[in-house]
Amino acid sequence: MIHVLAVITTKPGLRSQVLEAFHANMPAVHAEKGCVEYAPAIDTPGMGKFQTPIGPDGFMVIEKWATKEDLMAHAAAPHMAAYGAKVKDMLANRVIHVLSGA
């Protein structure tokens, strides 16, 4: 199992627009071979010092893929290129962690 945690930071005030595009792309991703989980998440309010907030312009993408090859095919998929082109000017930063079980 391959795990991906991607921290996405949008330009100020654009998170909802990026999430709208993300949600529109989700059905195509969920239909991909090997996709176990693919979903965005935002900060849970009221957690205090227990958490390190992503912030109002950020969200995390939580992914699970059956194999590394499935993840690589996902990254090269035409719908991902289209999503990337749609949101690229709205993003300030992205950090992607690709992990394996320990």
Predicted regions: what they are:
Residues L14-P40, H79-Y83, V87:
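Short amphipathic alpha-helical segments
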Residues K11-G13, G101:
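Generic structural motif
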Residues P27, G34, D70, A92-I96:
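Generic structural signal for secondary-structure transition and capping sites
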Residues A39-D57, A82-A102:
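Glycine-rich beta-strand-turn "strand-cap" elements at beta-sheet edges
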Residues M1-I2, A102:
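Absolute protein N-terminus
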Residues I2-T9, A39-A75:
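Short, well-ordered beta-strand segments in beta-rich or mixed alpha/beta enzyme
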